[in-house]
């Protein structure tokens, strides 16, 4: 009887190992991609490592105040005359 219960646990352990390997592969892949993006930004002079580029872009553009979420017809608001919805 003891060997039967041990055999029942073996597939569960294999599933856990397979899930761990799959998740680790995804994490490693995304880390490599992020590292490449930071490296490309550093070599091109744009991005988070450039002191002349703001860390957080402003939605209104450079020098424009933040006016909140953009106006969309879905929100039930009307944009000011001459602006895009």
Swiss-Prot record:
Coiled coil: none annotated. The chain crosses the membrane at residues 13-34. It is a single-pass type II membrane protein. Residues 1-12 are cytoplasmic. It comes from the Eukaryota. It is found in: Membrane. Residues 35-85 are extracellular. GO terms for cellular component: membrane. Associated with pathogen defense. This is Protein WIR1B. It comes from Triticum aestivum.
């Amino acid at each position: 009887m003891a060997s039967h219960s041990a055999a029942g646990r073996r597939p569960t352990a294999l599933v856990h190992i397979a899930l761990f390997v799959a998740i680790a592969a995804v994490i490693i892949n995304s880390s490599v991609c992020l590292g490449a993006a930071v490296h490309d930004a550093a070599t091109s002079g744009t991005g988070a490592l450039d002191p002349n580029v703001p860390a957080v872009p402003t939605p209104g553009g450079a020098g424009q105040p933040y006016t909140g979420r953009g106006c969309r017809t879905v929100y039930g608001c009307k944009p000011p005359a001459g602006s895009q919805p």
